[in-house]
Amino acid sequence: MLSKNLISSALINVVPGFSNADTQVLEAQSLDTILELLTNLRSVEFPCAILEGRSNGAIQLVEGPVDFFTQSVWIMGQFGRGEDESDVYADTHALAIRLLAKLIQMRNAGEPALEGWDWRRTQYMKRYGGQNARGWEIVLSFTENISLLMPEG
């Protein structure tokens, strides 16, 4: 993944609600893995960010070609009974905007070149009831091969 540290730093330093990179910034290689993480809600502290790599050949058949120049960041929140899901979308939208602003600021300070971004609303609903997770997927595009920027080890 493009430095989990980069995204974690951006979230922990400027986005309210994020304080623990170990429980709130998660990693996955495909949509199925993300949904599996969200199904086990006990292991997820909301709000959370899930970094989805696209450089794993296993996702090629389902989600398109292996890609070393983009990375998805999912910003997710949850709502319970009596709460309005539109509030969760609004809250996670605000978190996503703050994250993007910080990443652009970091890019201007010399971090890997962020070429652009795209986002869309995404939904997840636990199959057998319980809590709901809602949020946004941000697809970050970089001008460099981010697999070469990953720390060794």
Task: List the model feature ranges, each with a label.
Residues 1-32, 37-45, 49-153:
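Charged, amphipathic alpha-helical segments and their flanking helix caps
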